Amino acid sequence: MRIVQVCPWFHPHVGGVESHVASLSRELVRRGHDVTVVTSRYDRSLPEREEWDGIHVVRAKTFAVWLRTPVAPATKAVLAGLEADVAHAHSPPPLTSYYAARACDRRRLPLVITVHCDVEVPSALGPLVESAYRRTLEPATLRRATRLVVTTSAYAATSRAVWRYNPEVIPNAVDLRRYRPDVDGRPVRERHGLRADEPVVLSVGRMVPHKGLENLVEAAQHVPYARFLLVGGGPEASSMRRLAARLGVADRIVFAGQVGGEILPAYFAACDVFVLPSVSRLEAFGIVALEAMATGKPVVVSDIPGVREVITDGKEGLVADAVNPEDLALKIRALLADDKKRAIMGRAGRETVERSYSIEGVVDRIEKVYADAVGRASA
C-alpha cells in the first residue's frame, strides 16, 4: 500500500508526535508498504526531499511558524502530486491537517486523522478567535476524515473536538527493539558527571509551558539527595535555568539539551525514576512515559486525562498532582526510597508495554483502519 503520513514536524525536529510517526512509518516500511512523510520545511537548511530510514520525506514550503504552527499551504500541492492509496494526518497543530483534508477531499483520497490532543487557542487571542476556530476550521477538518483516531479512551470521552465523530481508540506505541531494560545507561551518567551510586530522576520533553517543568524544578528542592536530568530544548530552557539558580538547586539539575533519538534509550536506562509532569491537555498521551516503562523504569505521571490512563497507579508507577510540586516530590521520594518497589514497577511497566503498546500490535490495528478507509472511499 502507498501510504502518506502528514505531520507538522518531523525529523530532525524532536517531539512525541514526531517519534510516533517515525516508529509507525518504520514498521510500515518493514512490512513492505511504501511510506512518504509530508511535513513542513520549517528550517530552510533542510532538504526538500530525502530518504530517511527507508521513508520518503517531502517538506513543503513554509512561510512562517505562527503560534508554534507551521504555515505551509504548499502541503496541499505536495499531496496533490503524490501517488497514494491513503493519507494519515496527525493533529495538532491544526493547519497541517486542514491542508491535508482539503487536498484529500479534492482528489477523493481516503484520509485518516489521528487527533493527538485538543487544540488550545491562546487566551491572548480572545474568545472570539477560539469560537471562530471551533465553528469553522476544526469541523471543516474533522468532518473530511474517512476515519478518526484518538490515542486514549479518556481523551475521547473528554475532548471538546472529537467525541461527536465516534473515533477509534488506538494508542501510540513503542519500538520494543530499541527501548529495552538491557540498554546500558552508564555512558550517559559518565557524560553528565552523574555518579553510579546517586539517584537520578529523568524527564524528557520540549521545554514549553504545558510540560510542567517549573513544578519539577520546584520539586527538586524537596528531594535534596537526588540529581535531576532534564532532556529537551525549547523556549522555556533559559527560564528553567534561572529558576533552578534562584531556588538553589542548579547544582543538582543537569540540562542535557536536545538529544538525538538514536541515543535516547540510554538516557532512560541511566535513570532510577522517570517523571512526566505535564499540566495541560496538550499532553494527551505522553509517549515518553511508555519509553521509560519499556526500558524497565518506574514512572511518576500527571493526573490529567490521557496521561494517567497509560499506567495503573501503584502498579507501573505513581500518579501525582503535577501542579503541586510537593506532591510531585512526595511520589519521587517514595520510589527512590524503595529499591524493591522500583524493580517490581519497572518489570510491570515493561509487561504493560509489551501487552498493549508494542509498535507491532498498534500497526496491526492501523493497517485495518487504512484498509477500511480505502474500502469506504471506493464504495
Language-model-derived ranges and their functions:
Residues 41, 154, 173:
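Carbohydrate-associated surface elements
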Residues 142, 258-259, 266-271:
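Short alpha-helical donor nucleotide-sugar binding micro-motif in glycosyltransferases
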